């Protein structure tokens, strides 16, 4: 079973610049291959699949050198996300893929775990090309790390969602005492420890009586 755990991160100035570049580059790659797949089908009746686009990505990075400044796996994931969007469209699970706009105030990219490129520490997380980023952990799961999705929300805050598989469920011991509940007539609820909750009807009468005094 796969499960994602979302944590807030606090990148420094240089890291924020790199994240902005990565958001922009992954959007560029997504839009580039969306246009290429659309044109190939409309002009020549050819359907370009993920493999064809992934191979072409190598040439695209040579043409646009600035693509090499960001995480290469994130660029591949952008191509994969586009392919997934097409698959969902053909299965009638979603609309035809749309171009990603620069004007959106929500950005994200996904990268995969490989050779220790992503690692979670006590107060930092290591991300490809970004380095060690300060993190506020919600919990430390036990499982096999698959990848990470880095995002920036409209408020300007940054988050990372770490995806794991084979996650161990943590069972917390009960720290409260068992309490029996009995419904009464005059008293609304009577707990086994003797505590009583007054019936709302009698409570209202009591309040009116106090107000008349």
Predicted stretch roles:
Residues 1-213:
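Nucleic-acid substrate recognition interfaces
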């Amino acid at each position: 079973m796969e499960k994602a755990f979302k944590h807030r991160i606090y990148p420094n100035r240089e890291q924020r610049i790199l994240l902005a570049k990565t958001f922009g580059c992954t959007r560029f790659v997504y839009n580039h291959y969306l246009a290429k797949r659309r044109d190939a089908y409309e002009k020549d009746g050819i359907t370009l699949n993920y493999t064809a686009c992934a191979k072409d990505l190598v040439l695209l990075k040579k043409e646009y050198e600035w693509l090499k400044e960001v995480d290469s796996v994130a660029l591949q994931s952008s191509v994969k996300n586009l392919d997934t969007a097409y698959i969902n469209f053909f299965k009638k699970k979603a609309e035809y893929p749309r171009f990603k706009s620069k004007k959106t105030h929500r950005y994200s990219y996904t990268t995969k775990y490989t050779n220790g490129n992503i690692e979670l520490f006590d107060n930092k997380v290591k991300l490809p090309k970004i380095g060690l980023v300060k993190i506020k952990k919600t919990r430390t799961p036990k499982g096999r790390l698959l990848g990470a999705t880095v995002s920036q929300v409209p408020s300007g805050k940054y988050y990372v969602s770490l995806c794991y598989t084979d996650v161990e469920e943590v069972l917390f011991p009960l720290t409260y005492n068992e309490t029996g509940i009995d419904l009464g007539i005059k008293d609304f609820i009577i707990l086994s420890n003797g505590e009583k909750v007054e019936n709302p009807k009698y409570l209202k009468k009591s309040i009116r009586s106090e107000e008349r005094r």
